[in-house]
Amino acid sequence: MLACVDIRAEVFTTLPASLHYRGEPNEWVRVTRPGQKLHSFLEGPAFDADGNLWCVDVPYGRIFRIDFSGQWTLAHQSDGQPHGLARLPDGMFAVADYRHGLTRFDPVRDTVVSICEGVNSERFRGLGDITRAQNGDLWFTDPGRSSLSDPSGRLFRLREGASTPDVMLANVPYPNGVALSPDGRFVYLAATRANAVWRLLADAPDPVYPMVGLWVQLSGGLGPDGLAVNADGFVAVAHGQAGRAWVFDALGDPVACVRTPGGLWTTAVAWHPDGARLAIGEAQTGSIYVADLGSVLAAAKGKAS
């Protein structure tokens, strides 16, 4: 096993002051960040086919597009609370919205339509994050206010062409980021309040709930938030309230610790289409950080082979 490399990320861009929210704290802020005023809370970065980076502002219902030069455009605003984005083949985005459930955002028409708001006549408790599998299935999390004292968060899968999602897990202490291995066999799940990343089979033979293993145990901070897997199977983990993101190989060995030199609220990660550069969302300063991990990943691949 190679030694874990410590890397300092660089600021790519920061939300401009002209886009700061300046009103009174809304309910989301009062509950999740008591006593604070937030100008934004960035989550869910996702690259489009042209290399633009999209991200969401959870409490204020905003979706931003960031171009190559780091310029921000407000692409959409609503009364929702978008937490995560997954790009769809037609250029639209599936959105995990804490308030409105699973929706579809069309960036060309600037429209949002509902995909589903709940399951079995029960509304979702509050969606957290989402990813799209190669076969078209949508995997998304429903943490609500779950934690170690109430491990009732859920993981869902909406199969391609289906209208109702399946409950895959219902016992997670705040399920958050979710990602799949390149071959679609494994699902990685951030159990934020357990400070751990779990792993399960996407198509397990179990008749009800699949067997789940603790894949990586973190320490410190709040816990893992967003997850992202590149084409070579390297798993990036945003370590919430720790000011860093981790990169693990497919065996779960740490390859790199990428530190953000600004705030500590590292919320989300996204691999650039080149598979070497990692974008990290940091909500305290409203910044997107970038780290080029090409040489580190190449060394790790060479060691594995």
Model-inferred region functions:
Residues 26-35, 70-76, 113-121, 164-170, ...:
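A short beta-strand motif characteristic of beta-propeller blades
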Residues 200-207, 292-300:
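Short loop/turn segments immediately following beta-strands, especially the blade-tip
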